[in-house]
């Protein structure tokens, strides 16, 4: 039977991608249905209990700047907050928070249940309704059919998921959850390229069996950072430390002597694992010269005794896992409460997607999260928001939107996936972005909130706060530009006490702030330049904008040059065999990828600058050279 009411957008899956997709579509006023196999696991952290990190924290801030959920949820659930790379420049500083799994899940579910235009329904999906190469609905395991104008697939590791512990394996979407086998079969029938990937998780340890007295503590930052531009530190629950232990030669001997029982090394697992989150087996074998590896013991929550040992992801048999755990300092009597495991699952080649994350072959069908070959909650959330907003726009007969590489890490993520594809789980790093100085955590709202407002993602409260911040930045910069001190002025001695070289000529507040030894905090304690802004976010922007003004202007010039190529569009139906002068390799790659622009074509492996020049000349001769607005 068909459900009596039609929907604009259906989201399949309630993980980090699915929840952001559902919230985005509903915020934009579209009637949205979130289908999940279990309402109690909405927003579940399947692996490590943490949000953020290098590159990842940037994505969370961008999701927040566009009105998303993740940053608000972690502000209510984070039990240890830190700034990584705090001593480095603002481009690579990143926020990370340890999470209480239960509080995080509660925050996500509460937000979903209070979101207008959103209905949640518990049933596994087994089929899609496709008519004339367009998706028009979904079918659940009890045969109930839902109609919609767009469908977003955010199914994580559930598609034909297979869990491995030692040489034993069984079907599962994650520990304790069933896989989605019928949906996997259905998707394999569609004209989509499919592959297998693998990820893993470590055993969980009973905290009561660990001797923390012999371990080093790791505390959070002070003052405590905040993830959401709308948040404050008073929202954070009780803060707790993490602990550090290490593997040793005994640990490594145990692993080496049991490699024949590892599903990876025995050839049982065919999927490729994440390069930047390797299993402990991989670390021991790949870095054979290392006699130890650092392991972080991270609490899973304020009401849980479980500890997540970050760094020993493994699929070795349970008896070997016990030996590994008990070989480390402080863990000699430790008990495992959940075994570690590896999981293999289907993913679909993201090169078959438009930058909006809509399929090139099935109209109205969007993909987000691990199904696209990524790893990580943050990467999933960012894709979910983008897919959700574009599904909503499609259902309202509006053009899709995707950020450029120069606009957001989300733009880098999507462009990398859609242009280059991936053969291993893709993780975001700051090093993947060409324009890191422009794409900082601290200015995510300045880059994206106005766009989010135009798209219908940003509510009145956030918009008012954003405009107040803009006014504070502009007013303070004008004040510092117009406030001067001369070498002969009475205040000069007070200013000189904070400088490595005394004033030799008249200087404005901005001139002084550009000096390496001067900070905004110091400057605004000096008589001519007091008082400081009470808006800490605006104060941070003033300092960064002034200190890095020259570098930022230079990078903006680079972006404008790059945009000329990025905005030169390529016809979707162009057969590159028509372009004389291109090599067979370049023709094959361009016909395979079907890039949307010259900029995208230039990032395809094997497409040379010479080939791009030939293509530009040919387009001009054919009268096909056109640029987007």
Curated annotation (Swiss-Prot):
Pfam families: GIDA, GIDA_C_1st, SAM_GIDA_C
GO-annotated cellular components: cytosol
GO biological process, one term: tRNA methylation
Residues involved in FAD binding: 13-18, 125, 180, 370
SUPFAM superfamilies in UniProt: FAD/NAD(P)-binding domain
Gene: mnmG
Protein name per UniProt: tRNA uridine 5-carboxymethylaminomethyl modification enzyme MnmG
Principal location listed in the UniProt entry: cytoplasm
Family label: Belongs to the MnmG family.
Upper classification of the organism: Bacteria, Pseudomonadati, Pseudomonadota, Gammaproteobacteria, Enterobacterales
Summary of subunit composition and partner proteins: Homodimer. Heterotetramer of two MnmE and two MnmG subunits.
Binding residue positions for NAD(+): 273-287
Database matches in InterPro entries: FAD/NAD-bd_sf, GIDA_C_N, MnmG, MnmG-rel, MnmG-rel_CS, MnmG_C, MnmG_C_subdom, MnmG_C_subdom_sf
């Amino acid at each position: 039977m068909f459900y009596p009411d039609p929907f604009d957008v259906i989201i399949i899956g309630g993980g980090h991608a699915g929840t952001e997709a559902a919230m985005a579509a509903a915020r934009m006023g579209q009637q949205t249905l979130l289908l999940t196999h279990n309402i109690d696991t909405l927003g579940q952290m399947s692996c490590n209990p943490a949000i953020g990190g290098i590159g990842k924290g940037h994505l969370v801030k961008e999701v927040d700047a566009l009105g998303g959920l993740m940053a608000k949820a972690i502000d209510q659930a984070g039990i240890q907050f830190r700034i990584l790379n705090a001593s480095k420049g603002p481009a690579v500083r990143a926020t990370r928070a340890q999470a209480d799994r239960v509080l995080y899940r509660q925050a996500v579910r509460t937000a979903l249940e209070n979101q207008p235009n959103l209905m949640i329904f518990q049933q596994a999906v087994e089929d899609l309704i496709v008519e004339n190469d367009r998706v028009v609905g979904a079918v659940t395991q009890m045969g109930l059919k839902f109609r919609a104008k767009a469908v977003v697939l955010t199914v994580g590791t559930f598609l034909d998921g297979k869990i491995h512990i030692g040489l034993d394996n069984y079907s599962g979407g994650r520990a304790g959850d069933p896989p989605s086998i019928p949906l996997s079969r259905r998707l394999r029938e569609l004209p989509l390229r499919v592959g297998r990937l693998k990820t893993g998780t470590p055993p969980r340890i009973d905290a009561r069996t660990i001797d923390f007295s012999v371990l080093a503590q790791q505390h959070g930052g002070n003052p405590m950072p905040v993830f959401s531009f709308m948040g404050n530190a008073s929202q954070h629950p009780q803060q707790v430390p993490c602990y550090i232990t290490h593997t040793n030669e005994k640990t490594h001997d145990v692993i080496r002597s049991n490699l024949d029982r590892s599903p990876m090394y025995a050839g049982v697992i065919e999927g490729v694992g994440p390069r930047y989150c390797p299993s402990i087996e991989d670390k021991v074998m790949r870095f054979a010269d290392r006699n130890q590896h650092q392991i972080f013991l991270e609490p899973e929550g304020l009401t849980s005794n479980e500890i997540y040992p970050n760094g020993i992801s493994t699929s070795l048999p349970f008896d070997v896992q016990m030996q590994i755990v008990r070989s480390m300092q402080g863990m000699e009597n430790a008990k495992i409460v959940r075994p570690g495991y590896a999981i293999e699952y289907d993913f679909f080649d993201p090169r078959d997607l438009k930058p909006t994350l809509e399929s090139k072959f099935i109209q109205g069908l969007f993909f987000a999260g691990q199904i696209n070959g990524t790893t990580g909650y943050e990467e999933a959330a960012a894709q979910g928001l983008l897919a959700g907003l574009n599904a909503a726009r499609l259902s309202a007969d509006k053009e899709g939107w995707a950020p450029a590489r120069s606009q957001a890490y989300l733009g880098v993520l999507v462009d990398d996936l859609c242009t280059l594809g991936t053969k291993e789980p893709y993780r975001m790093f700051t090093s993947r972005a060409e324009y890191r100085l422009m794409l900082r955590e601290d200015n995510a709202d300045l880059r994206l909130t106005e766009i989010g407002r135009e798209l219908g993602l940003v509510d009145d409260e956030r918009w008012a706060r954003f405009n107040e911040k803009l006014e504070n930045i502009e007013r303070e910069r004008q004040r510092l530009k117009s406030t001067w001190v001369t070498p002969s002025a009475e205040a000069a001695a007070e200013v000189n006490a904070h400088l490595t070289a005394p004033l030799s000529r008249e200087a404005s507040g901005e001139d002084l702030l550009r000096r390496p030894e001067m900070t905004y905090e110091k400057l605004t304690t000096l008589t001519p330049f007091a008082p400081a802004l009470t808006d800490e976010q605006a104060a941070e922007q003033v300092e960064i904008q002034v200190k890095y003004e020259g570098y930022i202007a230079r990078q903006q010039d680079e972006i404008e040059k790059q945009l000329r190529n990025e905005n030169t569009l390529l016809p979707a139906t162009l057969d590159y065999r028509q372009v004389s002068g291109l090599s067979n390799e370049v023709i094959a790659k361009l016909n395979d990828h079907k890039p949307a622009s010259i900029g995208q074509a230039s990032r395809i492996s094997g497409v040379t600058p010479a080939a791009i020049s030939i293509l530009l000349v040919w387009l001009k001769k054919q009268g096909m050279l056109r640029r987007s607005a």
